[in-house]
Amino acid sequence: MSQESDNNKRLVALVPMPSDPPFNTRRAYTSEDEAWKSYLENPLTAATKAMMSINGDEDSAAALGLLYDYYKVPRDKRLLSVSKASDSQEDQDKRNCLGTSEAQINLSGGENRVQVLKTVPVNLCLSQDHMENSKREQYSVSITESSAVIPVSGITVVKAEDFTPVFMAPPVHYPRADSEEQRVVIFEQTQYDLPSIASHSSYLKDDQRSTPDSTYSESFKDGASEKFRSTSVGADEYTYDQTGSGTFQYTLEATKSLRQKQGEGPMTYLNKGQFYAITLSETGDNKCFRHPISKVRSVVMVVFSEDKNRDEQLKYWKYWHSRQHTAKQRVLDIADYKESFNTIGNIEEIAYNAVSFTWDVNEEAKIFITVNCLSTDFSSQKGVKGLPLMIQIDTYSYNNRSNKPIHRAYCQIKVFCDKGAERKIRDEERKQNRKKGKGQASQAQCNNSSDGKMAAIPLQKKSDITYFKTMPDLHSQPVLFIPDVHFANLQRTGQVYYNTDDEREGSSVLVKRMFRPMEEEFGPTPSKQIKEENVKRVLLYVRKENDDVFDALMLKSPTVKGLMEALSEKYGLPVEKITKLYKKSKKGILVNMDDNIIEHYSNEDTFILNMESMVEGFKITLMEI
């Protein structure tokens, strides 16, 4: 139904909708008195209300009854506290969204104040104290996308469950009368996934309230940080938020030494070549959240204690590497156990003493590592005390492009051979038991004069799990050992290649900055150069077509030049006279000989040598047998 008045009158429409909420209304204002006078002459009768009730429209009948009762009161006697809305553009910009799911509000009767709500479907309920004094059965109105005129008393505290910010269409500004005042509905939000429920007072400051149209909280204007991000934040914009140095916890499943020194990190005994489990987890304030982007990168490394500078550490590592039976021997290895690979990804051997991997802080990560060096491997003298080593773990934010870790922890280790860790623990237990017996005997003598009871002396207990100690220093760079040997599975001297496509550029920058080319400062190790040259030599067996015995051609370098020098030395051909060099396969394919064929496909192969004299020089063809 609708009616149009004079110039000072406005069109008001009440439209019942067929959706779940039985009654939707357009936004109404207090300046519509003249528009309602004609309807007051024909009030709702009991028969009309009964007919509407039969048709299942009790809420519409109740709402119309409230409106009729309201407009029967003269305008000058009403208690109206709806203020004039500001016409400034700033207020219009603030009218964004206020979203939740499916609205239902319980109203109290007998009052004649007007409350205007603008919202998308929310799940609303009055506070307990207000519900006890209200007549919910008589005046229950469901509010959906449209606005409703609702009589309430005072300031109504409303509780919103499962609050989720949404974005609405640009707001439309409606002018209000001069006598209107601003009214407020205070939303008390139930915070999900939080250990404690924050009261609605935490969102207000000095009893100030914002209008329902505003999505800006007063507490955010004074510099306070908001607790929830908008759903429009993309994955690339998210940076893992660390709350302090105690965010992460690492444990090593190895026997802890019984002789721990005060002020130093935990000491653990390991056996060389034996795998031990390391567990990584998050234990800080962020643990109660399910992070949307929660991947971090951790680097596990074996380093020397802090009293050794970079040059000393590299000197020790080079000495150890020169005494190994193979140049591929690593200081630290990670096992390819299924239990480990289910919790980590993107594993990289970034250095001989370090491995890198990514893991999800929402889940506990577990890796298995082994240390391949002894504590006494860094000196040629026998009987010297071994150097203390450390297992250090640096954790970096996955999307952050800084080379500064967000957390760092370490554990001291001593590495023994042939079950030496167990023998060391047994020796410490025997020494501790002897001290315990002596202590109890002396304590008994002291207490015999009093009550004859012996006081127990606190002793260190054996523990099979060692907790890493957090390091406050996050700025110093660890020393990563990368010898001057090229291997396909090793990313060396800052050249980092990732195995998956979802890696971020920030992580690559992080790893590149962590180590420097050693040959720039120290040069390659001579012993390694000799071994490398021995591996690169190529041996070929050749004979002429009419010969029965093969000649051996030893190439000093696996190149075309090396082959030409070997032919010149064996058959007396000037190197500069060899103009063409071909290889003919068993299938009869003739190809130009190049360095790649000689190095990778010709070692210890047999060929028939064919030499043709030409004007410009010799044409040599090696036919594969």
Swiss-Prot record:
Keywords: Activator, DNA-binding, Membrane, Nucleus, Transcription, Transcription regulation. One of its GO terms (cellular component) is nucleoplasm. Disruption phenotype: Mutant embryos show an epithelial and anterior and posterior neural tube defects leading to death at around 11.5 dpc. They exhibit a fully penetrant split-face malformation, associated with cranioschisis. Closure of the remainder of the neural tube ocrurred normally with the exception of the posterior neuropore. The dorso-lateral hinge points fail to form and closure do not proceed beyond this point. Residues 244-482 form the Grh/CP2 DB domain. GO terms for biological process: anterior neural tube closure; bicellular tight junction assembly; brain development; camera-type eye development; cardiac ventricle morphogenesis; cell adhesion; cell junction assembly; embryonic cranial skeleton morphogenesis. Pfam families: CP2 (PF04516), GRHL1_C (PF25416). Residues 1-93 are annotated as: Transcription activation. GRHL genes (GRHL1, GRHL2 and GRHL3) show a paradoxal lack of redundancy despite their extensive sequence identity in the DNA-binding and protein dimerization domains and the fact that the core consensus DNA binding sites are identical. They have related but remarkably different functions during embryogenesis because of their differential spatiotemporal expression patterns during development. PANTHER family: GRAINYHEAD-LIKE PROTEIN 2 HOMOLOG, TRANSCRIPTION FACTOR CP2. This is Grainyhead-like protein 2 homolog. It comes from Mus musculus. The gene is Grhl2.
